[in-house]
């Protein structure tokens, strides 16, 4: 018996031990209870551990190929079911998640050698990861997390937002089936028939959930922190955008409009406020109007604030709605050509500036100079360490802002979405773990770093 035949025999024996023939594997990813779903995902993980890396790679490649024809319909269904955002931008987000999320190539191996021998660092899976997906980015988060977590060798229990139930369950079923056809293992990706808040609580407390990956607001992240498990938490953001007097105003205006209007400002990385130096404020606003922004006067801003931010808190019924819908809700006439973004000059303490509203209304605050802009941006970002954007031709100022704000994503002279690999360099992620410090997540985020030491050898220098 040669080495290859021996490896095959051992793998078959281990598979039989981990999944006895008499125990029928049930389910296609969707289960009636949390316990059944997690148990199935755990059994799937035990079998998945025995697969070579090329199996993980085959699954990722198949996902990229087979999900591509469905991205547009998933985007349309997501927008329709949640009532937020628009199908065109959701398609772009789905495509970015599918094409730009790294696979097993992210699991780099590091070796150190010296007189005492060799040290090897490699990434290994955690087990079953409990992933919470939001209603703002439901399908893109599920695609992104599935690729990252499966590439790292884990199985996944998804806890979709109830407001995106139908499209999420449809996508999870598709991913589970693609993975099964690649490796013969059922239930690598699972969820429950009725995703609820109570189901999420049960998942977080389940002993077979090794790690929690939470993409959502501060409340759900805080709940996960109380579980006693390792949490990779993606919380809220309130990204400020600074424009100084050296900026290319035409490019800045276009980039800001593109970023702040993207999916009706639903992405947590999108520009939420604009802080501009007085000297160029009026010219920047005029350029923004030329790219499709509608400037509101103080009376119109007050009307809009009353319906969109009652008592300073975002009206959930208007989150992720179009500019035209916001205008109609406030009783403001909608132009014949609907605007891409609403803008208006406000004071620094306006609720539009101090709260993450997730609406296509960009408040503008004018300041005397760059130092004042940076001070205000630091205050507006509130130490969330999420995202900030700046437009300037002054490299020293750009570096100072990046160092001062300490955000997980800092975009220089581009639209905010360049920070997640859309129209910019780098990989895509929709789980930006700011509260827990991992930042932009990828496959290696969902793996354990392990150290293997061999003494007295393997240094050939």
From Swiss-Prot:
Residues 1-18 are annotated as: Targets protein to the BMC. The lineage of its organism: Bacteria, Pseudomonadati, Pseudomonadota, Gammaproteobacteria, Enterobacterales. This is Propanal dehydrogenase (CoA-propanoylating). Transmembrane segments: none annotated. It holds the Pfam family Aldedh. GO terms for molecular function: acetaldehyde dehydrogenase (acetylating) activity. The keyword Lipid metabolism does not apply. A CoA-acylating aldehyde dehydrogenase required for optimal 1,2-propanediol (1,2-PD) degradation. Optimizes growth in the bacterial microcompartment (BMC) dedicated to 1,2-PD degradation by minimizing propionaldehyde toxicity. NAD(+) and NADH are regenerated internally within the Pdu BMC by the PduP and PduQ enzymes, which reduce NAD(+) and oxidize NADH respectively, although there must also be cofactor transport across the BMC. Directly targeted to the BMC. Expression of a cosmid containing the full 21-gene pdu operon in E.coli allows E.coli to grow on 1,2-propanediol (1,2-PD) with the appearance of bacterial microcompartments (BMC) in its cytoplasm. One of its GO terms (cellular component) is bacterial microcompartment. It comes from Citrobacter freundii. Interacts with PduK, probably with its BMC-containing N-terminus. Interacts with shell proteins PduA and PduJ, interacts with PduQ.
